[in-house]
């Protein structure tokens, strides 16, 4: 009788014991930092970035000697970097970037001499850049930006003075 109880106990708890001992690599990564592949481009600071779907985009920046205008796409599923079409505007650092409706946007920044206020759209499907209406605020760098409900927002930053103004951009109306 005691052997039957032990057998029933083992049969009942064996799946729990086995599943508790299983190792799922994905679980090991939840809530932890882990290294992914290094970008193939130049090391840099003051770059800009946005995400579309499961891909991250890194644009422009400064390598310590020059301002950059390259664009890189990180594919999180493949853990790979691919160079995309270079940003056609003035090379810069400290620009803002955001995604709105599956397109990326980049604008403002500093080219070493001028505070910039131009604004550009990146289409990842066609790998092309198109200039959009200039940002109506003063040229600036170090601003903040985000995309919400089909609009891009840019504000704050520095143009010789610290700023707190905000503007919204409607991609459909290009204004």
Predicted regions mapped to residue ranges:
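Bacterial N-terminal signal peptides that target proteins for export
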Residues: 1-8
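Hydrophobic, helix-prone linear segments
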Residues: 5, 18-19
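Kelch-like beta-propeller repeat domains
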Residues: 11, 15, 21-175
């Amino acid at each position: 009788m005691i052997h039957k109880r032990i057998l029933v106990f083992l049969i009942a708890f064996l799946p729990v014991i086995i599943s508790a001992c299983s190792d799922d690599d994905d679980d090991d990564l939840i809530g932890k930092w882990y290294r992914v592949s290094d970008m193939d481009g130049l090391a840099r600071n003051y770059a800009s970035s946005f995400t579309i779907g499961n891909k991250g985009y890194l644009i422009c920046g400064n390598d310590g000697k020059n301002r950059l205008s390259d664009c890189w796409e990180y594919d999180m599923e493949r853990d790979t970097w691919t160079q995309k079409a270079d940003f056609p505007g003035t090379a810069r650092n400290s620009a803002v970037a955001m995604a709105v409706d599956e397109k990326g946007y980049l604008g403002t920044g500093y080219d070493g001499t001028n505070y910039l206020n131009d604004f550009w759209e990146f289409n990842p499907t066609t790998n092309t850049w198109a200039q959009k209406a200039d940002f109506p605020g003063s040229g600036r760098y170090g601003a903040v930006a985000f995309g919400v409900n089909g609009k891009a927002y840019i504000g704050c930053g520095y143009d010789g003075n610290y700023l707190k103004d905000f503007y919204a951009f409607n991609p459909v109306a290009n204004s």
